[in-house]
């Protein structure tokens, strides 16, 4: 699918060079422009591309943009947007991420990659098991108040090591790791009666519990 992406842009560049070298009638030019526009619309549809400004303005559209990006990633259609020099230059003046992701630190779940988003698109807060505390809440509030992000996504994932540790109930847990496990234990207990994989069941419950906690926070995150 990457070849399709490159071919699309190569076609535009080729047309531009041709227009500069060959005189054509106004009618022929309009036909070429219409063809490019049609190709562009079809390409965006095939790759589930959603306008970024719309995603920033409306959290429902923002969620669709994330889901479309994840679908591209799963289907091998990743386009890796907003990684060019022009975007980097613009971001020197500030950032306007359309979503805040509260996710796990697991190295197998890089948020920009699995959602196929670019620089400045996502404000990301990551801890093991996406366990949140005061610093995480403050980071979310910063995203909402200062960056005007309207969408907060709590992202869990299968085979989470932190949740697996809580499910196994280890003894003599060293250091601050015990803090993570204790925070997840209640989710493990709530999901223990469910059929299926106990770790993945606890992962889902952990996400639900964290969302409910965020909704109860006053006064800033409660408004989301």
Can you say where each PLM-predicted feature lies in the sequence?
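Catalytic-core segments of thiol-dependent peptidases
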Residues: 92-93, 100, 157-158
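Short glycine-enriched loops at secondary-structure junctions
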Residues: 103-108, 128-131, 157
